[in-house]
Amino acid sequence: MDVKTYPVLEAAKNRTLVDNATYLKWYEESVADPEKFWGEHGKRIEWFEPYTTVKNTSFDGNVSIKWFEDGLTNVSYNCIDRHLKTHGEKTAIIWEGDNPYIDKRITYNELYDKVCRLANVLKKHGVEKGDRVTIYMPMVPEAAYAMLACARIGAIHSVVFGGFSPEALAGRIVDCESTFVITCDEGLRGGKPVPLKENTEKAIDIAARQHVMVNKVLVVRRTGGKVPWAPGRDVWYHQEIATVEPHCPPEKMRAEDPLFILYTSGSTGKPKGVLHTTGGYLVYASMTHQYVFDYHDGDIYWCTADVGWVTGHSYIVYGPLANAATTLMFEGVPNFPDAGRFWEVIDKHKVNIFYTAPTAIRSLMGAGDDFVNRSSRSSLRLLGTVGEPINPEAWEWYYHVVGAERSPIVDTWWQTETGGILITPLPGATDLKPGSATRPFFGVKPQIVDNEGNVIDGPADGNLCITDSWPGQMRTVYGDHERFIQTYFSTYKGKYFTGDGCRRDEDGYYWITGRVDDVLNVSGHRLGTAEVESALVSHHLVSEAAVVGYPHPIKGQGIYCYVSLMAGEVGSDELRQELVKHVRSEIGPIATPDKIQFAPGLPKTRSGKIMRRILRKIAEDDFGSLGDTSTLADPAVVDDLIANRQNRG
């Protein structure tokens, strides 16, 4: 296949922290002697007591991952206190509100004050080291304060995306037995209020029925809207922080003490609590932030993600603040008030580094070039993408139209589980190919295997594994180490299996081809097909459901649902709408089905397993090559699904 290559731009080459020769040298050192390499780079953060052990990891047997394990440090101290002498008056966070006329800047000195006060409020209400605190917030600075305050006192935060439903929030509260929730009266998205406190109330009731009692809710006032209130349990953030001291000593944390839990979708059942720890995570998040984005002091850096996702954790909060950067937090959406919003924000705040998702790029590309061209974007020098593979057409538009051919694009591949970027170009070192994540970051050892687990060398197409640990890697599934081993290390023994398909070309560049398990990637966010199926089946008229992904021009993957109804029930447009609403209320708007096809039967093997491969083909209108159907219990079901495929909406 003929692929255009874009050589490293002269401007990027001239200011880069890492040129190609340095990349090759460091990479070789990092995989040949990881102990020595990370022993050196672990010193990029400050330690109260230095580590003497660097790497103690095993991908075999009981799988154990430990980095810098005898060192003592604190993430909040590294993101704030250590910068105060030299960068105290520097802007730490630029907050751009949903309303284009509202913004504010928070300096590192102010950040220290806010985080210490909030840490003292947590302590006042009995939160101790190791306790789990749930954060269900919109994109406001207080969300970052809450994360850093937890880290300061050694509490473990579990941030839940503000777009998730009360049921999804409750599931996450119950799984980690969290008794303290931080939320807002309401969020604002695209000019519309989001009922966060009301959702929290419902979630607390659901959790209580499962014997997990939330005994304190700290509420940030964002809109001033009327919200349900439980005196004694609920307290206002603004009142509480006025009652405490503006200083709070950072807890000395072991490198392997938990920092946060973040729930992510799997191919089976309920979301997994991905557990990240303190030292290795911060070393990796800060190092990738510096070198992948070629961050120099004074750069204005904007990642458009939400703190409810791992990208927000690593590349809005922890990575940038550990590097004393100015990080922009955006409350709004790309198309409000119109599709020029991103580009206006770039001009307004003179953004140098811009990191967003292919979904947003595709949707803004569809809105036309005029919205882009009415801004200058002259401050931009680096573009990035994250969340899903970017199609070459969108890459080219991003490079030529948004970047005006002046900014390299770092197409970054990583996961909630990896803690930070694993495969990526480095702007001053890597020639670019549209659609390729290019080469591994330092210390990352990718391997492509076939379905039987045989290693394929050279140009290859197969399943992407990583053969050795890196400091940012998740340590376990919260409360379920067996599930951790089963999910990531049992498919290909002794290797971390990413769940992604991958192609490596003749230049050694990696091209991510998408999930190979039953996980959807919708608008850059992971969603398990099992989650959507169980939401559908919980509706009283549904007897069975199967969910697959199909190519979607904006979202990357759309959600296609095959639904079998209870005996005697008939599908209708009204029922279709009702099911869409039902799924949204069970999981959240992110899980909105794009197409629902009523199906009297589903294609199953004689052992009762649904043949999703066939369902995917029908969803994609590719039923000319269904492959081997000899194991089907009832082949007529497939003919019926094909004949009835117009019955989708």
From Swiss-Prot:
The keyword Isomerase appears for this protein: no
Post-translational modification: Acetylated. Deacetylation by the SIR2-homolog deacetylase activates the enzyme.
Binding site for ATP: 387-389, 411-416, 500, 515, 526
The keyword Acetylation is annotated on this UniProt entry: yes
UniProt cross-references to InterPro entries, sorted A to Z: Ac_CoA_lig, ACAS_N, AMP-bd_C, AMP-bd_C_sf, AMP-binding_CS, AMP-dep_synth/lig_dom, ANL_N_sf
PROSITE patterns noted in UniProt: AMP_BINDING
Residue numbers binding CoA: 189-192, 311, 335, 523, 584
Cofactors named for this entry: Mg(2+)
Modified residues (N6-acetyllysine): 609
GO cellular component entries: cytosol
UniProt-listed Enzyme Commission number(s): 6.2.1.1
GO molecular function, one term: AMP binding
Family recorded in the similarity comment: Belongs to the ATP-dependent AMP-binding enzyme family.
Name of the protein: Acetyl-coenzyme A synthetase
